[in-house]
């Protein structure tokens, strides 16, 4: 740590504190993630090891945050990353209105290039969300926080935990307890992020896993084996039943979005994971080649992360234009008593 001068604190993650720092000799500005070991015998946390392994296995890519160094410090170690000024969550949070179409296209295009690169290297991120998409001073978007990333098995034989991904961006198969999954979980998250950029607020802001499923089915309709053949094989399929409900056209959910945007969004937000459009294929979608074209990164908003007041908590289920998703949770369930243990009072 002697080679760095700490300039300020950026934030705190699951396994450490992140600082803005300056290299004493070179003057380079970096982000230092300090990971403390609670007990030496516990070893390095798995999430930290996964992040290091994932980033080291991928060659430098302009859409993935660069890990510059790893070194021991006190009772732990430090990861030195390239410094990024802000993140996409800050961009959405500070936008006075939904982003312009050209801006949405630019952010989504950069995200898809990063996701395509990860998937080409057999890396599934498993926690894509706006807060993990960092923005540089030049407007460049880069994927960060690979603490949940794994090398995926193309034959689908490997078992994983389903408790990954932040709830609002968690794929339906994970909500149903799937232990075998692939890059489809990232593609669902990309769709959620795209919808949030178009809408200005999250599409599926559930407070627990059951409510999360309810938000999804209110737009996509009730899943069934006809549209999702693997549904009945999921561990939690029989634990809760939903009333039959038809899907809502995306143009009613996002009436200001272009037909091309809705077509691409609909190819991400599909129940069967293997039917979701691949990131590499999505980059060739007509959405990116119709006016307005994606904005240049230098034309994108870049809010400062440091010195910005803490945002207010999300108020809960929002009204999405003229389409309401804030109906009582019980209206979506066959047996409302099943959700009583999951409902927070007050």
Curated annotation (Swiss-Prot):
Gene3D superfamilies hit by this protein: Phosphorylase Kinase, domain 1, Transferase(Phosphotransferase) domain 1
Gene Ontology CC entries for this record: cilium; Golgi apparatus; nucleoplasm
Positions of the Protein kinase domain: 4-288
InterPro entries to which the protein is assigned, alphabetical: CDK, CDK20-like_STKc, Kinase-like_dom_sf, Prot_kinase_dom, Protein_kinase_ATP_BS, Ser/Thr_kinase_AS
Main subcellular location: nucleus
GO molecular function, a single term: ATP binding
Domain of life, per lineage: Eukaryota
SUPFAM superfamilies: Protein kinase-like (PK-like)
Keywords in alphabetical order: ATP-binding, Cell cycle, Cell division, Cell projection, Cilium, Cytoplasm, Developmental protein, Kinase, Nucleotide-binding, Nucleus, Serine/threonine-protein kinase, Transferase
Top enzyme category: transferase
Catalysed reaction, written as an equation: L-seryl-[protein] + ATP = O-phospho-L-seryl-[protein] + ADP + H(+); L-threonyl-[protein] + ATP = O-phospho-L-threonyl-[protein] + ADP + H(+)
Chain sites annotated for binding ATP: 10-18, 33
Localization, UniProt: Nucleus; Cytoplasm; Cell projection, Cilium
Catalytic residues in the record: 127 (proton acceptor)
Gene Ontology process terms (BP): cell division
CDD domains with a match to the protein in the record: STKc_CCRK
Protein EC: 2.7.11.22
Family as reported in the entry's similarity comment: Belongs to the protein kinase superfamily. CMGC Ser/Thr protein kinase family. CDC2/CDKX subfamily.
Role played: Required for high-level Shh responses in the developing neural tube. Together with TBC1D32, controls the structure of the primary cilium by coordinating assembly of the ciliary membrane and axoneme, allowing GLI2 to be properly activated in response to SHH signaling. Involved in cell growth. Activates CDK2, a kinase involved in the control of the cell cycle, by phosphorylating residue 'Thr-160'.
Subunit: Monomer. Interacts with TBC1D32 and MAK.
Descriptive protein name: Cyclin-dependent kinase 20
Species this protein is from: Pongo abelii (Sumatran orangutan)
Gene this protein is translated from: CDK20
């Amino acid at each position: 740590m002697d080679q760095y001068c700490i300039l300020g604190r950026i934030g705190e993650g699951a396994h450490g504190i992140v600082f803005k720092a300056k290299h004493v000799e070179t003057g380079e500005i970096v982000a230092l993630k300090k990971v403390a070991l609670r007990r030496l015998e516990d070893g390095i946390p798995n999430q930290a090891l996964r992040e290091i392994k994932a980033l080291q296995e991928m060659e430098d890519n302009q859409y993935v945050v660069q890990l510059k160094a790893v070194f021991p410090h006190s009772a732990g170690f430090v990861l030195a990353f390239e410094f990024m000024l802000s993140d996409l969550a800050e961009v959405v949070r500070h936008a006075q209105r939904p982003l312009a179409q050209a801006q949405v296209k630019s952010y989504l295009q950069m995200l898809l290039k990063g996701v395509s690169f990860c998937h080409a290297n057999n890396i599934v991120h498993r926690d894509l969300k706006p807060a993990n998409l960092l923005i540089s001073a030049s407007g460049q978007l880069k994927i960060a926080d690979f603490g949940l990333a794994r090398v995926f098995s193309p034959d689908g034989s490997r078992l994983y935990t389903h408790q990954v991904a932040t709830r609002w961006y968690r794929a339906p198969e994970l909500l149903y307890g799937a232990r075998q999954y692939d890059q489809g979980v990232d593609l669902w998250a990309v769709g959620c992020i795209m919808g949030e950029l178009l809408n200005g607020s999250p599409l599926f802001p559930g407070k627990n896993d059951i409510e999360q499923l309810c938000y999804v089915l209110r737009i996509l309709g009730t899943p069934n084996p006809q549209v999702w053949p693997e549904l009945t094989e999921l561990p939690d399929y029989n634990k809760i039943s939903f009333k039959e409900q038809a899907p809502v056209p995306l143009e009613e959910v996002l009436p200001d979005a272009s037909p091309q945007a809705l077509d691409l969004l609909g190819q991400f937000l599909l129940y069967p994971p293997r039917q979701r459009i691949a990131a590499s294929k999505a980059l060739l979608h007509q959405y990116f080649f119709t006016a307005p074209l994606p904005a240049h990164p230098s034309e994108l908003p870049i809010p400062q992360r440091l010195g910005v007041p803490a945002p207010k908590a999300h108020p809960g289920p929002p009204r999405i234009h003229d389409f309401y998703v804030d109906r009582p949770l019980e209206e979506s369930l066959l047996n409302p008593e099943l959700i009583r243990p999951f409902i927070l009072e007050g």
